[in-house]
Amino acid sequence: MIETDILVVGAGPSGSLAAKEAALHGADVILIDRKSEIGSPKRCAEGVSKDGLAQLGIKPDPRWIARDLYGVRLVSPNNTSVWMDNNTIKIPEAGYILERKVFDKHMAMDAARAGAKIMIKTNATSLKRVDDGIIVSTNHMGKDIDIHAKIVIAADGPESRIGRWAGLECNTEFKYMESCIQFEMAGVNMENNRDIALFFGSVAPGGYVWIFPKGDDIANVGIGVLKNKTNKTAYEHLMEFIKTCPETKDAQPVEINVGGDPVGGIIKDRIGDNILVVGDAAGFVNSLTGGGINSALESGVYAGIVAAQAIKDGDYSKNNLKEYVSLTDEHIGKHYKKYNKAKEYLLSLEDEELDEIAEEFAKADFEEVNPRTLIKMLIKVSPKALVKLGKLF
């Protein structure tokens, strides 16, 4: 039996930041991950905002930056393009395309430098509550090992089992789980390899197709779809796009990534006695964009700080962990509620309506672009949006 103050399950961005902050604040921390190599295989499009990293004190490192981005291109079903470039418009959400395999590993290294112990190839197999905490049974390098912790932080992704084992209702409803698949491809003929491209409409029911540039002709080309919106698989939709899009029809895959993206909003049941849930496991994903790295990092920071303080207090009850809910609601959740409403509205639109909106957007003059200003412009150009979204601002 291994004893620790805090056990973090999952060494993705949220788990590593939680482990780092908890260790920096004086707690004894163990961070476990089931994979042989932290960060591999990658499971997302790898985009992250510069402002988000800066707010968390994470300095950019060329070793984990694949591409510095300048802007975004939104493409409607009839191929109307809305260009938004950082050279002419302020885009706080502009950022980087990461090498996630390297980024995740560096975040874990920072946790180790802060004092956290790391156990790789360690799979959590069960959990039970005891009077003085939680015991998580694991298989570590083929050997069964129990870890006794006063507090467990569940950072085990959208298929999270830890929160459920601990008695929390933290599973994402099927209708809000996007099915995602992505190729890293070579030979992509991008119109601008410093801008990300997002394709909307029936090409990706319930989601969108993305092209995220990683080099001159290298890009992540992927799709997210809601399975209750289509009879086809995400793979079938993506292959149809790749074969017909001029930018990708001659490209070849060098890697494939698959996974689920919870876009139903932040779960309410994200704390309990002796436990906190962070990152994708807690639904910290922007339902409008599907992006979750920045909010995952932020949720991890708050969880680590709150958990470490609870250790100092000697009180690991749900009541003493509720500051985590307050912090995430204040700094992340208030925006996500608006994004959820906007997502629901966009899902109600036909391709022709998206084309009309894109044509109006293409003529608009933006001073700054972020989800908030885009929603405001949507309300301005679409009477239907005014009815559905007018009360958001």
Swiss-Prot record:
Residues that bind FAD: D33, C44, A45, G47, R100, A124, D280, G292, I293
Q: What Gene Ontology cellular component terms go with this record?
A: membrane
Matching InterPro entries, A to Z?
Answer: DGGGPL_reductase, FAD/NAD-bd_sf, Geranylgeranyl_Rdtase_fam, Geranylgeranyl_reductase, GGR_cat
Cofactor: binding comment: Binds 1 FAD per subunit.
In short, the EC number is 1.3.-.-
Q: Give, as one word, the top-level EC class.
A: oxidoreductase
Pathway in which the depicted protein is active = Membrane lipid metabolism; glycerophospholipid metabolism
Which PANTHER family does the protein's record reference? DIGERANYLGERANYLGLYCEROPHOSPHOLIPID REDUCTASE, GERANYLGERANYL DIPHOSPHATE REDUCTASE
Additional observations: Reduction reaction proceeds via syn addition of hydrogen for double bonds.
- Write down what this protein is called: Digeranylgeranylglycerophospholipid reductase 2
